[in-house]
Amino acid sequence: VLSPDDKKHVKDAWGKVGEHAGQYGAEALERMFLSFPTTKTYFPHFDLSHGSDQVKKHGKKVADALTLAVGHVDDMPQALSKLSDLHAHKLRVDPVNFKLLSHCLLVTLAAHLPAEFTPAVHASLDKFLASVSTVLTSKYR
């Protein structure tokens, strides 16, 4: 459960991401593909090379979903319901992959926002991404 302080940290940090959200989303995906090569199996039709348009577009989708979640932090299950259905029923993404992407997102944010990425903000973002992952995997059951 996100505390009021967690919610403030997440909103403030994501606000700093701003117009770079798509770029950071793509960078996190690239990190995930390089660090955890098995995640590539969900993207057999993608050009996964550095800077590919497909990775950039999907990175923007990831960032847009996170922006939606930040904006609806008190009602993520409703806000992310369609995305949860998609990942559970159509794409059938193994839930562990959300944890891997979350880790890569944290690394990316820490690299780009070192001054803002305090231990408290790190913990809040980690809890937020875990909450998003829980929502996205809730319809697997």
Curated annotation (Swiss-Prot):
Red blood cells. The modification Phosphoserine is found at S3, S35, S49, S102, S124, S131, S138. It holds the Pfam family Globin. GO terms for biological process: hydrogen peroxide catabolic process. It comes from the Eukaryota. Keywords: Acetylation, Heme, Iron, Metal-binding, Oxygen transport, Phosphoprotein, Transport. The keyword tRNA processing does not apply. O2 binds at H58. The modification N6-acetyllysine is found at K16. The modification N6-succinyllysine is found at K7, K11, K16, K40. One of its GO terms (molecular function) is heme binding. GO terms for cellular component: blood microparticle; haptoglobin-hemoglobin complex; hemoglobin complex. Heme b binds at H87. Heterotetramer of two alpha chains and two beta chains. Belongs to the globin family. Involved in oxygen transport from the lung to the various peripheral tissues. This is Hemoglobin subunit alpha. It comes from Theropithecus gelada.
